[in-house]
Regions:
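Short Gly/Ser/Thr- and Asp/Glu-enriched loop/turn motifs at secondary-structure junctions
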Residues: 118, 407, 534-538
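His/Asp/Glu-rich metal-coordinating catalytic cores
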Residues: 1-66, 71-279, 299-308, 331
Length: 545
């Protein structure tokens, strides 16, 4: 009999940032380590990851981090967390591991504990074992993980859907799922992102019919994609192979992933059809445009604004928008679509018309029927998605009291195979990551918001080194605050206020710099707010000459 704790450090009540912990008698198993894309209001923040203090504090108990598939939301936090977890092993299938290695190399991280797993090959940890099972998702080699315990199995689905037409590295092993169900499942952790959508996701995930129509058109075709949309890119390539069109790829990450996938035989395409940037203006060319994970749409927005030196959009172009729009990215995607429309291109937006490879309500119910779990825990979705997942589970025959809708940090505790009503909470938070400086923090983010909204005022104070009196008139410069020529009187009065503060805190051969700095910021802040209605960030440069 075992003591089992299940909780999320990220991934509940949100899209992305997936990180789920299963603690079995102090043996810790971590499933996924993902990021979440920053929303448009998070100035200078590239992405967000779960705060992983719990993992650092318990790293000696961690048996491994198990990654379900090669999407940023599942593996994007690894470059940030692994350096502090030392020799914790990372387990993933072949294709997923190739992408992990690429991301770590890009971040200049040399990590030796990377262990490739094969679907349906058990990984033993004493009395506990982990068993990967193939599932269908938009990237090859996607898996869910079964954790076998003495009290029954725990199954984490990762992202999945059911589609009998999928083959090879995209195929779900339904037989293995049914077998696991017959052995007894204590708890099923199942994704929620499309739980509010009726029916099965298939065939609404396939874009081949519309792609083939688009390829029949004349002139150049520009396609906006995310690097992780492997199956949709493959559908596009399948269509291109039946035409005389060639491809130019813009975005180093996308180019590397596509070429690596072709080399490993995970993507089928004639590499001779991939041309250099010099062909970007050919009439029959297909231009694939993607970005690094930190700056979604940045390459395309640069092109729309006319800043790209290689490619200019024109009215003859067809623009195919395939990129998914994650929560918080609506403003950027709207700018992109509006920009294309203003140029007059033929715009085709597939982002909301075709589903991604996530489980809709019928997919969720089929998974429940195959596994017949005692308890059910909706994961990977905003709270409304978790509730929709709960409703699907009830329709599938689950008892409502056995459906566990939780928030990050809420612990589901099983003792000897029974749910214990114990109000345990693990502290959780998130880290805001700037690719250049690491964790940004709330204070820095607020400063950036203030700069964006109210501008900055720089006050330059020059003090005589000997007398400690003002050597020159105080200078005040502003950016993003007011147009100086239209507010000369305001700026003159600001100089007078700052001068008075300096003089009030100066004695013969002595000046109280702390009072000067605090006083100037305080008095100018009040003055600007009363006169202009905004309070800019006020920076002081105090120098002695």
């Amino acid at each position: 009999m075992a003591k089992i704790k299940i909780f999320a450090l990220g991934g509940l009540n949100e899209i992305g940032k997936n990180m789920y912990v299963v603690d079995i008698d102090n043996n810790i198993f971590v499933f996924d380590a993902g990021l979440k894309y920053a929303d448009d209001s998070m100035l200078g923040v590239d992405y967000i990851i779960p705060k992983y203090d719990y993992l650092i504090q318990n790293k000696k108990k961690i048996k491994g981090i198990f990654i379900t598939h090669a999407h940023d939301e599942q593996m994007g936090a690894l470059p940030d967390i692994l350096p502090e977890l030392e020799n914790v092993p990372v387990y993933a299938t072949k294709f997923t591991m190739e992408i992990i290695k690429r991301e770590l190399a890009e971040s200049k991280i040399n990590y030796s504990k990377l262990i490739e797993v094969k679907p349906h090959v058990k990984i033993n940890f004493g009395k506990i074992s982990v068993f990967p099972i193939n599932v269908t998702h938009s990237v090859p080699d996607s898996v869910g993980y079964v954790i076998n315990t003495v009290d029954g199995a725990i199954f984490y689905t990762g992202n999945f859907m059911f589609d009998s037409s999928m083959l090879g590295p995209y195929k779900t092993d339904i037989g293995k799922l049914a077998y696991i169900g017959k052995q007894g499942v204590l708890c099923l952790l199942s994704e929620s992102m499309y739980a509010d959508k009726k029916g099965f996701t298939a065939p609404n995930n396939r874009i081949a019919p519309i792609v083939n129509e688009i390829l029949d058109q004349d002139d150049r075709i520009i396609v906006s994609v995310f690097p992780n949309q492997f199956y949709k890119i493959q559908e596009l390539f399948n269509g291109i192979m039946h035409t005389d069109r060639n491809v130019v790829i813009i975005g180093k990450r996308l180019q590397d992933i596509i070429l690596n996938s072709i080399e490993l035989n995970y993507m089928k395409f004639d590499v001779n059809k991939i041309k250099t940037i010099s062909h970007v203006n050919d009439k029959n060319i297909i231009v694939l445009i993607a970005d690094d994970r930190e700056k979604p749409f940045s390459n395309f927005l640069r092109i729309i604004r006319g800043y790209d030196k290689f490619i200019k959009l024109n009215k003859k172009d067809t623009v195919l928008f395939m990129s998914p729009v994650f929560p918080g990215m609506e403003k950027s995607s709207s700018k992109l679509l509006d920009g294309v429309a203003r140029i007059g291109c033929n715009l085709i937006d597939l982002s909301s018309k075709y589903l991604s490879h996530h489980a809709s309500s019928e997919d969720l119910m089929l998974m429940i029927n195959l596994l017949n779990p005692k308890y059910y825990m909706p994961v990977n979705g905003e709270y409304r998605h978790e509730i929709a997942n709960k409703k699907a589970a009830i329709i599938a025959g689950m008892n409502e009291e056995n459906i566990l809708c939780k928030l990050n940090g809420d612990v589901v505790y099983f003792k000897n195979g029974k749910l214990v009503d114990d109000d345990i909470k693990i502290p959780t938070d998130e880290l805001l990551i700037d690719g250049e400086v690491g964790d940004v923090g709330e204070i820095v983010l607020k400063d950036r918001e203030m700069l964006s909204d109210n501008g900055v005022v720089v006050v330059v104070i020059t003090i005589d080194k000997l007398t400690k009196k003002l050597k020159h008139q105080i200078e005040i410069h502003s950016r993003g605050f007011v147009y100086v020529r239209d507010n000369i009187d305001v700026m003159k009065e600001a100089v007078n206020i700052a001068t008075k503060v300096v003089n009030d805190n100066t004695k013969p051969n002595f000046i109280d710099y702390n009072k000067v700095k605090l006083g100037v910021r305080d008095e100018l802040g009040k003055y600007f707010y009363n006169e202009i209605g905004t309070k800019p960030m006020i920076l002081l440069i105090v120098q002695e000459i």
